[in-house]
UniProtKB/Swiss-Prot annotation:
The gene is MT-CYB. It comes from Eliurus myoxinus (Dormouse tufted-tailed rat). This is Cytochrome b. A ubiquinone binds at H201. The chain crosses the membrane at residues 33-53, 77-98, 113-133, 178-198, 226-246, 288-308, 320-340, 347-367. Keywords: Electron transport, Heme, Iron, Membrane, Metal-binding, Mitochondrion, Mitochondrion inner membrane, Respiratory chain, Transmembrane, Transmembrane helix, Transport, Ubiquinone. It is found in: Mitochondrion inner membrane. It is a multi-pass membrane protein. The keyword GTP-binding does not apply.
Amino acid sequence: MTNIRKSHPLLKIINHSFIDLPTPSNISSWWNFGSLLGICLILQIATGLFLAMHYTSDTTTAFSSVTHICRDVNYGWLIRYLHANGASMFFICLFIHVGRGMYYGSYMSIETWNMGIILLFTVMATAFMGYVLPWGQMSFWGATVITNLLSAIPYIGTTLVEWIWGGFSVDKATLTRFFAFHFILPFIIVALVMVHLLFLHETGSNNPSGLNSDADKIPFHPYYTIKDILGVLLLLLFLISLVLFTPDLLGDPDNYIPANPLNTPPHIKPEWYFLFAYAILRSIPNKLGGVLALILSILVLALLPHLHTSKLQSLMFRPLTQTLYWILVADLLTLTWIGGQPVEYPFIIIGQLASVLYFAIILIFMPMAGMIEDNMLKMD
């Protein structure tokens, strides 16, 4: 008799995705972050659902309702901080996941990669709208500044901004619709994740060597389920430590001040995971140019498969491009730091140099290094 997991219509799909999935035998811990992202998503939906039960999306009561959750709801403070810091964990895992894809040339599976970019944009939109909901000073002014960027679009910009706001400023209508979108988007993300996995399982996983691993595959369960459980335990340990010891470490103190349209905070800045893109936006004096650079800072990832010049897929055997890759990582950390600094000398010039370097490495230096390495290895 065939095992039920292999014959049942629903269990069969789960079996082919998580149990009998043929997986390269040599994938390292950098491949753990896909499953960690899944855990983060489940955690965010679960905690978010409980928060939504007590939250009110009205400008007069939103801030108070968050305070009420933390003070009066059983373990409300825990749910709230798990949700807020869970978002940070989500983005840490996302950045590592994308970074691993860049390092090992996983972007050569174009459908999976493009689906990942769409997912990245969707998660960023969800996180941005979630940041607006507590209706603190940084929530209000962050929403005002970021939505206002759309006014840079020629001809329809101003109309578009007022349409998104639901009025002439960020107000009750804006908060209500942001809450609605913030609630629905994670479920759309779940659907997109399924498509992402569908494309991934069409081609199979890449591996550190970048070579074809068809001749050396092992079942996903028990080998990688055990390996993933270790990753999940470490992630939860890190998250729970953050939540219980320093829950406000990654937040902004200004968000503990209720939103006041008459008083602008000294430094308007988004959450830490958007600072690199915010620094790129600020480094261009022109508004439309800044908005385009902001979008391109993520969209440039879609060009990676077309900019791949080397005959080797992975960077494992390419020391020149490896060096450029780690300079790019350092550059992104620099941009993250700059995004949180005031707009004054020397931060402006550092931000501009780091922004130019970011695009130069991806668009010029890495493709050139690939050709040079091929030449040196006599692979032409």
